[in-house]
Curated annotation (Swiss-Prot):
GO CC aspect terms: ribonucleoprotein complex; ribosome
Gene name of the record: RPL12
InterPro entries: Ribosomal_uL11 (IPR000911), Ribosomal_uL11_C (IPR020783), Ribosomal_uL11_C_sf (IPR036769), Ribosomal_uL11_CS (IPR020785), Ribosomal_uL11_N (IPR020784), Ribosomal_uL11_N_sf (IPR036796)
UniProt protein name: Large ribosomal subunit protein uL11
PANTHER family, per database record: 60S RIBOSOMAL PROTEIN L12 (PTHR11661), LARGE RIBOSOMAL SUBUNIT PROTEIN UL11 (PTHR11661:SF2)
BP term (GO), one: translation
Entry's Gene Ontology molecular function annotations: structural constituent of ribosome
């Protein structure tokens, strides 16, 4: 069993040349895998940069999507998918709810370095700052300090 991780843009057939050195030696067709990845990521992750893990066993590839925190935050904004080729460096101006942030922190929990869910939420809020969106209409930095002050309670489950 071999695992290969690849960064792709959801719903797009990446050029086979970037996949070839990684999966060519395993006896798989890079072009076919590229199309499979595009099909797998089209409906949920269109236009978002995500990591895809290929688990290769007996020349069969299983595709699993590993979304980054940023991809999850952008997905929670529920913005319409934009054409990546036309618009570069998109600023996300929408607002995410605090319950969305807690939900994302739960999803990211196994890969997070945080001790508890509250700190996991602060990690995601930091990502929200980088994405450029607001949380319940407020700046994510203010929400982080509100969590530190105890003004916002985060359930430990």
């Amino acid at each position: 069993v071999v695992e290969v991780c690849v960064r792709v843009t959801g719903g797009e057939v990446g050029d086979a040349s970037s996949l070839a050195p990684k999966i060519g030696p395993l006896g798989l067709s890079p072009k076919k895998i590229g199309e499979d990845i595009a099909k797998e990521t089209l409906k949920d992750w269109k236009g978002l940069r995500i990591t895809v893990k290929l688990t290769v066993q007996n020349r069969q590839a299983k595709i699993s999507v590993i979304p980054s925190a940023a991809a999850l935050v952008i997905k929670a904004l529920k913005e319409p998918a934009r054409d990546r080729k036309k618009e570069k460096n998109i600023k996300h101006t929408g607002s995410v709810t605090m319950s969305d942030i807690i939900e994302i922190a739960r999803v990211m929990r196994p890969r997070s370095c945080a001790k508890d869910l509250a700190n996991g939420c602060k990690e995601i809020l930091g990502t929200a700052v980088s994405v450029g969106c607001k949380v319940d209409g407020k700046d994510p930095r203010d929400v982080i300090s509100a969590i530190d002050d105890g003004a916002i309670e985060i359930p430990d489950a």
